[in-house]
Amino acid sequence: MKKTMDGNEAAAYASYAFTEVAAIYPITPSSPMAELTDKWAANGKKNIFGQPVKLVEMQSECGAVSAMHGALDTGAIATSYTASQGLMLMIPTMYRIAGQLKPGVIHVASRNVATHAITINAEQSDVMACRQTGFAFLASGSVQEAMDLSAVAH
């Protein structure tokens, strides 16, 4: 299938196929991944297991990663989507997930971490802040790689 899409849509497309539970809290620039997953789940689109993804929209990034952790504890294949400050708020739960050897996937649209103003510039300080959590990190250099590595991560 040939289709023009951006990295968010590519990652969402591949991750939806392999996900049973998606815990979301939309945050720019990763919002399109969560919004597409929400749309597809609401329309009953099936994953590779023949089921629509169960989507849980939470009140914060902490809630999203905690819901993902809970889904992983039940044996579900779970994912979440985030960026920048949202990812850093997930760090305490990331330690628990990695320490329990749970195979969750967090898709990150990396951007600059701002202290005093909003920024949408790309950089990896948000991801680098999570290196010590025990999570493995895969980074794409193109839209095609975003889709491929999304599938590989699952």
Task: List PLM regions with ranges.
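Thiamine diphosphate
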Residues: 1-129, 134, 151
